[in-house]
Curated annotation (Swiss-Prot):
It comes from the Eukaryota. This protein may be expected to contain an N-terminal transit peptide but none has been predicted. Subunit of the heterotrimeric GatFAB amidotransferase (AdT) complex, composed of A, B and F subunits. This is Glutamyl-tRNA(Gln) amidotransferase subunit F, mitochondrial. It comes from Clavispora lusitaniae (strain ATCC 42720). Allows the formation of correctly charged Gln-tRNA(Gln) through the transamidation of misacylated Glu-tRNA(Gln) in the mitochondria. The reaction takes place in the presence of glutamine and ATP through an activated gamma-phospho-Glu-tRNA(Gln). Required for proper protein synthesis within the mitochondrion.
Length: 165
């Protein structure tokens, strides 16, 4: 009653049939032999755009909490490496996309709005959040059955200390 149909297309199924690997040494040799290199996918220098400059490198270092006061040659070297990364991302994105372009660059954004710091958490705000925690308890997250009596004692001590200050 049921009709099954299976069809294949040589255009869609591409593969390579290799000889049978008979022992661990053959498997090890096969796995050691590389078939491609990531450097083959890195575009040549003329295809690399200069989206990243020393200003962007300084900003990335500052946002990462690293020392941004590097000598200019070092900043230029970082910018060159990051431009190579962006070009690589674009190249890999283009390999798997029907539309060519700088799709990868949209992922590589350095907008100030992406890095707005949250307002600092004060002790009073933290204590307020702890008081409201019972309103947000979830069975799905396994938050029932936790004994908060010890926790409440410590919180009340901290609260009284904060009020004295």
């Amino acid at each position: 009653m049921f009709l099954r149909q299976f069809s294949t297309s040589p255009a869609l199924l591409k593969g390579k049939v290799l000889p049978e690997l008979k022992n661990a040494q053959e498997i090890s040799q096969f796995l050691r032999k590389s078939t491609w290199n990531v450097h083959d996918l890195i575009p040549s220098k003329e295809h690399i755009t200069n989206e990243v400059d020393s200003r962007v490198v300084r900003k990335m270092l500052r946002l990462s909490g690293l020392d941004e006061n590097l000598p200019e040659p070092e900043l230029n070297r970082w910018a060159e490496m990051l431009n190579t990364h962006v070009a690589f991302i674009n190249h890999v994105s283009d390999l798997h996309s029907s539309t060519k372009g700088e799709i990868g660059s949209s992922v590589f954004r350095l907008l100030a709005s992406d890095h707005k710091p949250e307002s600092p958490l004060t002790l009073k705000e933290l204590l307020r959040q702890v008081d409201e925690i019972s309103d947000h308890v979830s069975d799905q997250r396994g938050e029932r059955g936790f004994d908060t009596s010890e926790l409440r004692t410590r919180i009340n001590r901290a609260k009284s200390t904060a009020e004295k200050e």
